[in-house]
Amino acid sequence: MADSAGAGAAGQASGPAGGSSGAGGTVNPASLPPGDPQLIALIVEQLKSRGLFDSFRRDCLADVDTKPAYQNLRQKVDNFVSTHLDKQEWNPAMNKNQLRNGLRQSVVQSGMLEAGVDRIISQVVDPKLNHIFRPQIERAIHEFLAAQKKEAVPAPPPEPEGQDPPAPSQDAS
C-alpha cells in the first residue's frame, strides 16, 4: 500500500529540517506553496542556524530592564512577595519548599505576571518587530529560497563532443 500521501507524510516527519541540503530525495523548498508546514519548518530551521533568534533574544534582553513595564512588574512582585511572607509565621519546622511553591502559585494566580509580561512585550518586542526583526527575517528567507532555487536549476546539457559541426556549403562561388 504505497500511496503518495503516506510517503509525503513520512518525508515530512523525517525531512531535511536538520539542516541537510542537496540530494537524497529532499523536497525543493522553493517549490512548496506559501504556508506549507514543511516549508515553515525548513525556514525556521534556517533562521535558527543563522542565529537570528538568539540575536533577537539578546537584543530584547539588553533592552528589557530599562523599560517601565519591567521595573513596574519587578516592584509589584517584590511587594507581593514581601506581603505574602509577612503573613507567614516563621518556625524552624516549616517546609521551605512548600512555602516557596505556595508563594509561586499565589504569584501566578494573581495574574500580575501575565499582564506584566504582556506590557513588557509591547514596550520591548513590538517596537522592534517591523523595523528590526521583520527585515532580517525576510532577507534570510529570500536568501534561503534563492539558494534553493539555484540548487534546483539543472545545468544546461553539455555540447555533444562526438559530432562534427555541419560542413559549410560550397554553393558560393
From Swiss-Prot:
Keywords: Cell cycle, Cell division, Centromere, Chromosome, Cytoplasm, Cytoskeleton, Kinetochore, Mitosis. Pfam families: COMPASS-Shg1. Residues 1-15 have a biased composition (Low complexity). Residues 1-32, 148-173 are annotated as: Disordered. It comes from the Eukaryota. Residues 154-173 have a biased composition (Pro residues). It is found in: Cytoplasm, Cytoskeleton, Microtubule organizing center, Centrosome; Chromosome, Centromere, Kinetochore. One of its GO terms (cellular component) is centrosome. InterPro entries: BOD1/SHG1_dom, BOD1L1. Residues 16-25 have a biased composition (Gly residues). GO terms for biological process: cell division; mitotic metaphase chromosome alignment; mitotic sister chromatid biorientation; mitotic sister chromatid cohesion, centromeric; protein localization to chromosome, centromeric region. Component of the SET1B complex composed of the catalytic subunit SETD1B, WDR5, WDR82, RBBP5, ASH2L/ASH2, CXXC1/CFP1, HCFC1, DPY30 homotrimer and BOD1. Belongs to the BOD1 family. Required for proper chromosome biorientation through the detection or correction of syntelic attachments in mitotic spindles. This is Biorientation of chromosomes in cell division protein 1. It comes from Rattus norvegicus (Rat). The gene is Bod1.
